[in-house]
UniProtKB/Swiss-Prot annotation:
GO MF annotation terms: nucleic acid binding
NCBIfam families to which the protein is assigned, alphabetical: PRK12497.2-4
Similarity comment: Belongs to the UPF0102 family.
Disulfide cross-links: none
Transmembrane stretches, start-end: none
One Pfam short name: UPF0102
Protein name (Swiss-Prot/TrEMBL): UPF0102 protein TWT_455
Recorded superkingdom: Bacteria
InterPro entries: Restrct_endonuc-II-like, tRNA_endonuc-like_dom_sf, UPF0102_YraN-like
C-alpha cells in the first residue's frame, strides 16, 4: 500500500487513521493540523473533560519506532503550542486538564495503531 505513497501523503493517512481511532474510543476531535507561526499540532481532542494534544507519527513498519522520534525538545514545543491553541480558543489553561499523547500508525505488514497516553 505505502510503497508508492509520498511521505506527506503517508502522514495524512496516518492522521486520518488516528482521528478514526480516537473517535471510536470516545474522543471528540476539536481541531486538526492547527498551525501558528511557532509550529503545528496534529490533532487536538477532548475526552472526559481533558484537552489532549496528539502527536501522530506514521511509518511503514513497527508501531513502536516512530514514537522514538519525539524528543524532549519536541515535547516542550507541543506544550507551548497547546497553550497557544488554548489562548486562541479563549480557554484558560489553569481551569482545564491538559495532556499530551502520541499515536503511532504503521502500515506494514498490516495497519497497527498504538496510543501512548500521557507522554507529558
Amino acid at each position: 500500500m505505502t510503497h508508492d505513497v509520498s511521505k506527506y501523503a503517508l502522514g495524512r493517512i496516518a492522521e486520518d487513521k488516528a482521528c478514526d481511532y480516537l473517535s471510536v474510543n470516545g474522543y471528540i476531535v476539536l481541531d486538526r493540523n492547527w498551525y501558528c507561526r511557532f509550529g503545528e499540532l496534529d490533532i487536538i481532542a477532548r475526552k472526559n473533560g481533558v484537552i489532549v494534544a496528539v502527536e501522530v507519527k506514521g511509518g511503514k513498519r513497527n508501531a513502536d519506532y516512530p514514537i522514538c522520534n519525539i524528543t524532549v525538545k519536541k515535547l516542550s514545543k507541543l506544550t507551548f503550542l497547546l497553550k497557544a491553541w488554548l489562548h486562541e480558543n479563549k480557554l484558560n489553561e489553569f481551569c482545564i486538564d491538559l495532556r499530551i499523547d502520541a499515536i503511532s500508525v504503521t502500515f506494514i505488514p498490516e495497519l497497527q495503531i498504538r496510543h501512548f497516553v500521557g507522554i507529558l
